[in-house]
Amino acid sequence: MANKLTLSKSKINTFIECPRKFKYRYIDEITEEANEYMLLGTEVHEIAEEIAIELMEGNEIEDVFLNLEYDEELEDHIKGLNKFFKDIYSNGYEIFSIEEYIVDEESNMNGIVDIVIKNSRDELIIFDYKTGKPRNIDKYKLELCVYKILLESKYLDLNVVSAGIYFTSSAAYRIANFGSHSGDYFKSQSKEDIDDSDFDYVDAVVDNLYETIDMNYFKKEKGFLCRYCFYKDMCDGDFG
């Protein structure tokens, strides 16, 4: 494992989207310029972290949001974050960690987990913020599996029972459960589960990714998204 590229959910998702794009970004290390959507995501994540820190220090939610400074175009995202943190505290949860960077040498993965909350039974629930429109949880199961692997590799005595996406602009949840657990506010919003087959899929993609690196052949996944790709011009000039 020591000689292999350390993976993250972003690297794995990029490989699934297009192996050639993966090569440009992570093998050739050609940095993609930040677009408006990336900048928005960064700004909302920073504000969410600021809010969480204030709340963990014992400040009241109303006071935190009253004193919050932000641009007007972020209004919907701020309203969404307000609901999210109220849901946490009004339903008996506490914030366990925020923006935690974890490295798991066994799986050869790393990543930053946006926020983890804990219920009264010391069970953990992972959330990842998204600033786009709500989408089906199936799109995000892979990265939620990665987050569970990372978190449980560090906190060996704790169990991650659920993981979800929170869409800040629409205050919408998409949550999946790792097995069954009862009596949770966030579980009641979900009818989805993540099972062994989802983790098997992660393993299969990772194996394919490393095989592709070893063969040094990164095929193009041609489709309508190509026209928006940062690497389009150089990709069009490549053969294969």
Q: Language-model segments: which ranges?
A:
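Short amphipathic alpha-helical segments and their helix-coil junctions
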Residues: A2-K4, P19-I30, E123-I126, D203-I213
